[in-house]
Each structure stands twice: as structure tokens, then as C-alpha cells.
Amino acid sequence: MRKPVRIGVLGCASFAWRRMLPAMCDVAETEVVAVASRDPAKAERFAARFECEAVLGYQRLLERPDIDAVYVPLPPGMHAEWIGKALEADKHVLAEKPLTTTASDTARLVGLARRKNLLLRENYLFLHHGRHDVVRDLLQSGEIGELREFTAVFGIPPLPDTDIRYRTELGGGALLDIGVYPARAARHFLLGPLTVLGASSHEAQESGVDLSGSVLLQSEGGTVAHLGYGFVHHYRSAYELWGSRGRIVVDRAFTPPAEWQAVIRIERKGVVDELSLPAEDQVRKAVTAFARDIRAGTGVDDPAVAGDSGESMIQQAALVEAIGQARRCGST
């Protein structure tokens, strides 16, 4: 049996505690070796639960020879610096989305990973859930005719006042935290370059951080995409594809629980069919894929899942940046 990929973690984020590190400790392909924080108490808390070492400071973790790859759940505003340092230290990287806050930083890091022959992945977990490939197969087989319109939404209730996602200096805001999901889904189904026709957002009065937004995109073929996202909503995570002869609807699209049995609803000529799929743990699948690709010598331009490549990450960053520029022109 091959040795597991040895993982070091930069930062003690809630999502790492709840979802990613339990999966990394559970699958045979990875071993969590150490967790680094600038707060020793946080590092010790993580280390106690996940039976690994606590490290004070991110650089000290990167200097360790017993770590093959790092997982980066830091705030987005810190990603460019520490992903870059991890790659310079010859570590493979799995980073939470967004990879960085600018298209130029994303392109720079992808270029660095290419030169160092290292794996760099942006952690869009939903891409690892098989139902989205089923939906794309249905679309490409003509089940709903020609695609006319794509709609995707992701909204969550308000966060605690102290949540770092309300801090603009750390790359906070609804667009970079959850708006990126509908944008990535639009790219998954519409394919090719997307143009931002318009965007608007609602911002917090004091901090200026964006709390919600709407986006209108268009593909080269003329198909439009409507995206909605925000921190001030009843929970909703869904998308639909509206074609010339029918419609496909997917609920709990981006963050389904591992035990969730996905249902794809297909509407055609007044008839509704529901396609039930087995439950999948997209977190475990993402972790396993990352480790597998490291062992296989997969590079940044060899996708683990459709579209998950260096060039795709650059395209995603450029689209999100364009949305951000457009929303600032139309924000309230």
C-alpha cells in the first residue's frame, strides 16, 4: 500500500474544522501532519482533535520536510502570499476558493506551479459531485433542447458580526465567498468565454463589504445566465437550465450533506421526471482526487475534474474580477 500524502494546514478556519480535516483524516490517501496558526491556542485545539502537530506560524510549517502538500483555508486576501510561499517551498497546494482576489495573482501562481511542476487546485467541491456531470450529459444529449438560459443562486443567512467574511481587507464579501459558486456553475454548463452584461450589489453602510448581488452573463452563443448570491437570505443553493423543449432543476446544488440523495428534476411538455442518484460525499472525493493526482504526477494543467485546470482557474478569476468591477458600478 502506498504511503499517504502528508498534509500541512495553513490556518484554523471553521470550514477546515467542520468539513475538510475530518475528510483528510478519514481517507487512506492523506495524513494530516501539522496545523499552523499565528494563535497557538487555535493550533493546539486543531492538533488535539485531528491528532497532529501544532505549529506556530505559517512559514515554520512550510519549512518542514515531512509535508508533501498544504491545504490553505486562509481568508482570500491572504491566499496570494501564502500559496506563493507554499509553491516556492515545493509543496503542492489545495486552496479554498477563490484561489486569489485578482486575476493577475491567479495567473502568477498558476505560472509558478507550472515552472515548479507542482499541483495547484482551487477547492470547488461541488465539481466533484457526479450529478453535475449527469446534468451536463442530459443537456448535451438534447433532453431539454437548446439551452436558452441558465439561472443559479446561492444565499445564506446573516453571519455573526465578527465573521472575517465581513472584513474587506481580508478579501471578504459575498461575491468572493459564495457568489463564486454560481459563477463557476455557469462556466461549467455554458462553456467558453462569458461576458458580464451587468451586475449590482448591496453593500453594508459602514464597512462597504458587499452583502448580496445579482449578475447577468452571456455566452458567445448568446445564452444568458442569471446569478444571485448573498449573506442576507434564507438558505438556498440551486440552479436550473431552461431549454427550448424543457427545463432541468437541481436543488442543494453546491453544499449538499454527504448523505444527501440528489434528485434531478426534468420538466418536458407538462411531464415532470425525477432522476434520483446515490448519495455522494463530495468532500471525500475532492480530497481523494487531490492526493491521487499528486501521486500520479499530475500537473496544474491536467484537470482532475472537468475544467479544473490552470487555465480554467485563470478564466474563473478573470470572470469574478469582471463581475466585481461591474457590481461596483451598480452597487447600492
From Swiss-Prot:
It catalyses: dTDP-4-dehydro-2,6-dideoxy-alpha-D-glucose + NADP(+) = dTDP-3,4-didehydro-2,6-dideoxy-alpha-D-glucose + NADPH + H(+). Substrate binds at residues 19, 235, 255. It is an enzyme of class 1 (oxidoreductase). InterPro entries: Gfo/Idh/MocA-like_OxRdtase_N, Gfo/Idh/MocA_domain, GFO_IDH_MocA-like_dom, NAD(P)-bd_dom_sf. The keyword NADP applies. Its EC number is 1.1.1.384. Transmembrane segments: none annotated. The keyword Lyase does not apply. It comes from the Bacteria. Monomer. This is dTDP-3,4-didehydro-2,6-dideoxy-alpha-D-glucose 3-reductase. It comes from Saccharopolyspora spinosa. The gene is spnN.
